[in-house]
Curated annotation (Swiss-Prot):
Disulfide bonds: none annotated. This is Protease HtpX homolog. It holds the Pfam family Peptidase_M48. It is a multi-pass membrane protein.
């Protein structure tokens, strides 16, 4: 429940930030335009983001004939989660990772790299796919799509404010120093809010995945393995499309310093500790 409240508050914050920037650029009219612009971008993302992401990763759809063990595993977990059967995809990549996409449970897809299938045991793989189906059940793909779109739009509006200035309610030019400050600080604030939402949803998907599979320890050991293997294997498609990093079960981007501050995922150690506590107590709340 705490993660859901936190997510709602953060989404309200990123929406408010977007509208405030619109107001700084063009007063009440600017706020209205900013809101309409955000709605248009979210509409496009809602309907087409899954196709775009699967194409970016050159994901190939599989069925029971082409990937019988993997497909049956997803079907069994979807049944346990009371979800429609999602489309199932494989990505020919050595880096171990997986993600879910789709605008709702009826139009969902799950994808895994060939690398993760080689690295993990069947039990661990069940834990991973249960995590992805938890994202589907919680409609996290919609949440992440909206926040990513809003964060990108905030950055675009902030740049517009810096280069073209803005107007107050009376039509007078806005303070240029304020425009520069907005251009520098607003994208950072938007990105931080986006990352906080993503981290909250990852914790919730870990918990939900543990409930679906009934085996939190399997997901814990899977996360440990993915973390260790992924550190030495570049995920080229993810590096080329860093905005999609938040979709993955493990952050696929390499680097440290500021990149850790803007990480889309919680610390792996903390995720594992929470899952092991679930395994010890048998409680998923």
């Amino acid at each position: 429940m705490f993660n859901w409240v936190k997510t709602a508050m953060l989404m309200a914050a990123i929406t408010a930030l977007f509208i405030v920037i619109g107001g700084m650029i063009g007063g009440s009219r600017g706020m209205t335009i900013a809101l309409l612009f955000a709605l248009g971008m979210n509409f496009f993302s809602y309907w087409f983001s899954d196709k775009m992401v699967l194409r970016m990763y050159n994901a190939q759809e599989v069925d029971e004939a082409t990937a019988p063990q993997f497909y049956r595993m997803v079907r069994e977990l979807a049944t346990r989660a009371n979800l429609p059967m999602p489309r199932v995809y494989l990505i020919n990549e050595d880096a171990p990772n997986a993600f879910a996409t789709g605008r709702n449970p009826e139009h969902a897809a799950v994808a895994a790299t060939t690398g993760i299938l080689r690295v993990l045991s069947e039990r661990e793989m069940r834990g991973v796919m249960a995590h992805e189906l938890a994202h589907v059940k919680h409609r996290d793909i919609l949440i992440s799509t909206i926040t990513a779109t809003m964060a990108g739009a905030i950055s675009a509006l902030a740049n517009f404010a810096m280069f073209f200035g803005g107007r107050d309610e009376n039509g007078r030019p806005a303070n240029p120093i304020a425009g520069i400050a907005v251009a520098l600080l607003a994208p950072i604030a938007g990105a931080l809010i986006q990352m906080a939402i993503s981290r909250a949803r990852e914790f919730e998907a870990d918990r939900g995945g543990a409930q679906i599979s009934g085996d939190p320890q399997a997901l814990a050991t899977a996360l440990d393995k993915i973390h260790r293997y992924a550190a030495g294997i570049p995920f080229q498609a993810a590096e080329a499309h860093p905005a999609t990093a938040q979709m993955m079960i493990m952050n696929p981007l390499h680097g440290g310093g500021l990149q850790n501050l803007f990480s889309t995922h919680p610390a792996t150690e903390e995720r594992i500790a929470r899952l092991m506590e679930m395994a010890r107590t048998g409680r998923f709340d």
